Amino acid sequence: MNRLLVACAALIALVSGGAQSDPLAARSKGRPDAPITLYEMSDFQCPYCRAFALGTMPVLEQEYIGTGKVRLVYINLPLTSLHPNARAAAQVALCAARQDRFWAMHDLLFRHQDEWAKLPKPSGVLLALGDSAHLDHAALDACVTANATAPEVDADAARARRAGAVSTPTFYIEGGLLEGAAPVTVFRAVLDSIYRAKTGR
C-alpha cells in the first residue's frame, strides 16, 4: 500500500568529483529553482519503477515539471537481491549521463526491460541500447568496462537508504516518503498540497 511517511533524515545531495557545478543536473528534470524537489529512488529492473516511468512520469512532466513547479532527481537504488541486473543498468545509465544522455538511456532501459532483465550477461543488450540512445559507443564501452560509475551507484544507494527507502520506487518529497508506484492522483494531491504551502498559490 502506498503511504506517506515522515522521513527520519533528509536525503543528502550527491557528492561528485565531476566538473559540473550541479552534479545532479545530468539526471534531473525541471528547473533547478523549482519550489519542490522530488527525489525518485528507483531500480531499473523493478517492474513497478517501469510502470511509474512509462505511465505516471509523463503526466508529472506535463503538469508539474514542465510548468516549473517540480524538479525531479533520479537516485539509483538497485535491489540486487531481487534484481541481479539492476546494478549493471544503473552503471550504464550513469555512464550515459557523462554524455548528457541519461534520460534517453533511462527511457530505453525501462521500455526494453524485458529484453535484458533476466539475461545472465546483459552487457551486450545494454550497450546496444546505448547505440539507440545515440551515445558514443567507444566511450560508453570504456566507462562500463572500467566500472567507472560504480562509486556513484554505491553513493546513491547509501543515501537512499539513509533517507529511509527500503523498496522501489520510493519518492522523497520535501521531508516525506511516498512508497510504491502510486497513481497520478496521489502525486497530484501531495504535490498540489506542498506547492500551495510553499507558494501560497
Summary of predicted features, one role per range:
Residues 21-36, 64:
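A short beta-strand-turn-helix
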Residues 34, 42-131, 163-166, 192-201:
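Structural alpha/beta surface segment adjacent to cysteine/selenocysteine redox centers
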Residues 38, 105, 140:
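Divalent metal-coordination and catalytic microenvironments
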Residues 8-24:
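Bacterial Sec-dependent signal peptides at the C-terminal "C-region" and cleavage site
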